[in-house]
Amino acid sequence: MTAEPNKPCQIKRDYQQLINLYPATADTDAHYLSKLSIYQQQVFEAHSQQKLLVLGQIGLGNGLELLSWWRTQANPSQRLLLKVFEPNPINAYELKSLWDQSLTLVKETPFEPHLESKQASALEFKSELCQLAQTLLNAEPTAIIGCQRLIFDDGRTTIDLHFGDIQTQLSSLSHSPMHPVQHWLILPHLLQALHHQSHWQMAKLSDDSATIATIGLSESSELSETTVNSFQACGFTVSDINELATKALGIHQPVTLINHQPDAVLLHERQVLRQQDAKAYAFNPMAAILSSATQSSIAIIGGGLASAHLALSLAERGQGAQVFCKDAELGQGASGNRQGAIYPLLTPENDELSRFFQQAFLFSRRRVQALTSATAVNQTPISHDFCGVLQTAHDERSQLRLDKIIQGQPWPSEIAYAVDAEQANAIAKINLDKPGFFYPLGGWVCPFEYADAAIQKAMQLADVSVSLNTDILAIERQADGWVLLTEKERFGPFAQLVLANGAELTQFDASNKLQISPFRGQVSHVPAQFQLSQLATVLCANGYLTPSHQGLHCLGASYVKEPEHLDFCPQEQQENLMKMHESYPNQSWLADIDMSGNNARVGVRMVTRDHFPMMGCAPDVPKILKDYAQHQLTKESRHYWQTTPAPVHQGLYILGGLGSRGLSSGPLAAECLAAQLCGEPIPLDKETLCKLNPNRMWLRKLLKGKAL
């Protein structure tokens, strides 16, 4: 059961503030709903040949248009990616309040005999929207800055919510050559708020024949002329939904939305803008896009959370994969723990690391919900409990750090909020007697069940196979792709190969120079008894303690760099216990922690110095060093590294370095790599993608003109 903060924390704005920030585009009567439906059907018909239709929407409004796009999608062979840009972040609680109080989705249209058929249709329309609205609310959109990716219907519908300054959000994204935005809808209350620079950023992200529609443009001649001229100067055609729908009703035929061939000069200016963007980030090469001829030619080495979720993200796109796991079962490495905490890593500055982990945590949480949904077909159970995570300090230094995080930002309460000692005791259901920071949407998940469920779903959706007991000892690059070798067998060639093999990530010649370190972690399993069994949330202090699952709590974990063995260690078992005593001294429930059974599990997690995971092209380190020798600390060297694609092993990719928070970061990192491989828009900004790149440690120095 999700632990919820108090309602006053969740809804900070009253209804009048909400309707001012998120106004309805028009009265939700039969007239508007009919026009909206006709217009959106026209968009889908105009782009019916697209396997993935990418649409952009400026403004969330009251959410009606978003839900209607979702509802209108009818082509079973077409996927929809809807990118919504909204300057004012909103969470699920406020969105529900807005809908409940405005009756947007439930109010009945006053009966008019001559509109009887339209009104009946409108009520049916609203009924369908209500179901989608509840599905959207269940996904828990939160009021954070940046992109939140919401995936529905096994990948058939994807909604990217980009919250924050629209110009900033638009400019932070890269053009997707294979799947650009085909059409934009701009809600009227934001027309004047868009600057000309924003128009150009929209053009950068768009197909050259992309069009724009808005509502009520013709009602203001001054606004109409100014807006249309600005968009036309960027190569767009602008249409009014009212006029499109009226024309369609009049001639009883679809109206084309591709009205003209943009001026060649304007298209060239768009291309220049894209090239400037690409040049600025040339040092961060993207994955080579899979062609239709190589649809089944991708291999993934690894049997844990990373490989499973990459297979799932690929499968949602219809892309098959072959997964190679050295163990007899999935999830036997770092993903083999009984319980793992899932919550975001926050920093006082809310920098790229903090923002990435918020996005990733929410994405992973939604994955768990989708895979365990009552409507999921042949679902594989995932033991989990979104009971919240309560972070407390364990000494003076950690208290100062936690205070900086709490006071550093006006954190959305659905992400985290401060609690006093009394509130902490009430949340935990055992006495802690100290204040903390509560993550209400967090909790714990069983990692190996999570990985297995992802693989099982992937196998339902696409041609995904798993080869167990297959220990890949070497990989070789040949003219026609990558070949995988065991002691006795040979697999391939594969056009693309992803290394997602956890602790063995650096075992191959092509990956052994990655700047990443193994850390041993021993997790203690202790019986649930007496006061301890009442624990109702995950505790994180000097170590962590989970609520009971199948009669056991998880207590951990040790942190030993470059371990010599993975055997049970009595000393680490006692250290885990002492960490709890240091964190919550003199509490009576500590006596209930019984370590006498020596029950524990040992695993290895791969950790990067900057705490970001690694996702992207495998760096060709010998070639980097060779180029460095030729461009060593000259005046031109920084420019060279800035504008030259960093050397990589073609067709080889890294997905790893998930550290101690792989449950939070792994699924989104996998989703981003799958999007790259399939040439689709990525739900991360350009700067964050650079932070994930496996070559970042070398490039960070080279871009600053420093010695390696």
Show the residue positions of the predicted features.
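C-terminal catalytic lobe of FAD-dependent flavoproteins
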Residues: 590-708
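Helix-loop-beta segment of a Rossmann-like dinucleotide-binding subdomain
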Residues: 106, 348, 379-391, 421-461, ...
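Flavin-dependent oxidoreductases
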Residues: 355, 475-477, 485-578, 583-599
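Dinucleotide-binding Rossmann-like beta1-alpha1 core, especially the glycine-rich loop
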Residues: 339-426
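Helical element adjacent to the flavin cofactor pocket in flavoenzyme catalytic cores
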Residues: 437-482, 486-496, 500-501
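S-adenosyl-L-methionine
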Residues: 100-174
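Glycine-rich FAD pyrophosphate-binding loop
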Residues: 316-336
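N-terminal Rossmann-like FAD-binding beta1-loop-alpha1 element of flavoenzymes
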Residues: 296-323
